[in-house]
Amino acid sequence: MASRAGPRATGTDGSDYQHRERVASHYQMSVALKSEIKKLNIAHAVVWFLVAAQVLVSQLNLVSHKVVASPYQWEYTYLLSIIPTVFSFMALPKNNISYLVISMISGGLFCIGPILYGGMEMFPVAQQLYRHGKAYRFIFGFSAVSIMYLVLIISVQVHGWQIYYSKKLLDAWFTNTQDKKKK
């Protein structure tokens, strides 16, 4: 705000920022963590959709089993992993602590559990592929065990980060509620 003639008005040169209020760190952290969790939820939804598509195509016999292999047992239970993601999406808009806790617990049960079982279930087939170079199940011409191990690796990372960021977000929310109780 400069005048046509004369000096600039005091307080308009940008030096008046020190008296302004700042956003508390736990609110900043909450926004950042919510953003990360939303990205991870979307990544999980993509992985879940791919697994669901394979199970659906196989069960409905839409294509030959030579093109898309029949699913492993762990893939059926992994389909329940959409439940934690739904609870996570429901928890974020209103900072609902109980939904976030349900999401974390069910994430361990429905996400990490089937992934660990799947790694053990497919290990003999992967070992046979590595030692002898023979694969008996294929997905679009690629070894099914190789593709599903790739899915497992991606899923472990996505779910691990989901649980980690959810715990940090829960801590940020508890900091906020503890501050309110003190006042």
UniProtKB/Swiss-Prot annotation:
The keyword Lyase appears for this protein: no
Q: Where in the cell does this protein reside?
A: Endoplasmic reticulum membrane
Which terms in the GO cellular component ontology are assigned?
endoplasmic reticulum; endoplasmic reticulum membrane
Supply the alphabetized keyword list.
Endoplasmic reticulum, Immunity, Membrane, Protein transport, Transmembrane, Transmembrane helix, Transport
Question: Looking at the record's lineage, which domain of life comes first?
Answer: Eukaryota
InterPro entries listed in its UniProt record:
Jagunal
Q: Which residues lie on this side of the membrane: Cytoplasmic?
A: 1-39, 93-99, 159-183
Q: Which residues cross the membrane?
A: 40-60, 72-92, 100-120, 138-158
Q: Which GO terms describe its biological process?
A: defense response to fungus; endoplasmic reticulum organization; granulocyte colony-stimulating factor signaling pathway; neutrophil differentiation; neutrophil mediated immunity; neutrophil migration; protein transport; vesicle-mediated transport
The UniProt entry lists the main location of this chain as endoplasmic reticulum
Q: How does it sit in the membrane?
A: Multi-pass membrane protein
Query: Which ranges sit in the Lumenal compartment?
Result: 61-71, 121-137
Q: Which PANTHER family match?
A: PROTEIN JAGUNAL HOMOLOG 1, PROTEIN JAGUNAL HOMOLOG 1-B
Family in the record: Belongs to the jagunal family.
Q: What does this protein do?
A: Endoplasmic reticulum transmembrane protein involved in vesicle-mediated transport, which is required for neutrophil function.
Q: What's the protein here called?
A: Protein jagunal homolog 1-B
Look up and give the organism this protein is from: Danio rerio (Zebrafish)
**Lineage summary:** Eukaryota, Metazoa, Chordata, Craniata, Vertebrata
Q: Which gene encodes it?
A: jagn1b
